[in-house]
Regions:
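Short acidic, gly/pro-rich beta-turn/loop elements at beta-sheet edges
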Residues: 27, 144, 199
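Low-complexity, Gly/Ser/Thr/Pro-rich intrinsically disordered linker/tail segments
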Residues: 177-202
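Conserved active-site-adjacent core of cysteine acyl-enzyme catalytic domains
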Residues: 59-181
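Active-site nucleophile-adjacent alpha helix/oxyanion-hole segment immediately C-terminal to the catalytic cysteine
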Residues: 1-67
Length: 202
């Protein structure tokens, strides 16, 4: 008798973890953003309809300019992710009156010690209205959201269901020089009150 097939999960056939990381990052940042009035607390998390709309906006921009849908399968590089984060800021400005400020603290650096990355993430994530997106190198090739740094672990909000990542796994304990997380693939997100002139910056 043929073996019962295993169900495919999100990510098995698509490379949309970058899009999911942006959506999850915004959801987490909204969770801790200080709303001015208590009655707005219930509006911290976007509705399913809002999340679907944001997902469509990001997906449309990802494939724009392509005569095929390969970006959906092949995934998102750091340049594309940065562009999509800017589009997300436009969406937040329209729907929430907020702007999403994006920083790449180690952009252009070939190597950053694990402890320095962890310290930077930890200091950033204790602030309200923040999240971080990391790109994990091959063989995983995956974008994920960091919500907290705890001891020697990164606590995640991950589209593939992973709950944490050990620093020893991706840092100095890794055989490759830069570890599993390249400095260019670290994005710090912060929500602020919207100003039309405010854009995502490197």
């Amino acid at each position: 008798m043929p073996r019962r097939p295993t169900a495919l999960e999100q990510g098995a056939l698509d490379g949309l973890c970058g899009v999911y990381s942006i959506v999850n990052g915004i959801v987490w940042a909204l969770r801790t953003y200080p709303h001015p009035r208590p009655q707005k607390q219930g509006r911290r998390r976007p509705s399913d309809e809002e999340l679907g709309d944001l997902f469509i906006v990001l997906l449309s921009n990802l494939v724009r300019g392509h005569s095929h849908l390969k970006p959906i399968v092949e995934g998102t590089n750091s340049r594309q992710l940065f562009r999509l984060l800017s589009k997300s800021s436009d969406w937040l400005r329209k729907h929430r009156g907020l702007a999403l400020v994006t920083r790449r603290p180690f952009h252009g650096r070939p190597y950053v010690p694990t402890t320095q990355v962890a310290q930077k993430l930890g200091r950033h994530l204790v602030r309200p209205g923040t999240a971080a997106i990391l790109g994990i190198e091959a063989p995983f090739d995956h974008w994920t959201v960091v919500r907290q740094v705890a001891q020697q672990r990164l606590l995640l909000l991950d589209s593939a269901g992973t709950s944490q990542l050990s620093m020893k796994t991706w840092g100095e304990g890794c055989s490759r020089k830069t570890g599993l997380i390249h400095p260019d693939n670290i994005f710090l997100l912060k929500l602020t009150k919207s100003k039309r002139a405010r854009k995502a910056v490197a």
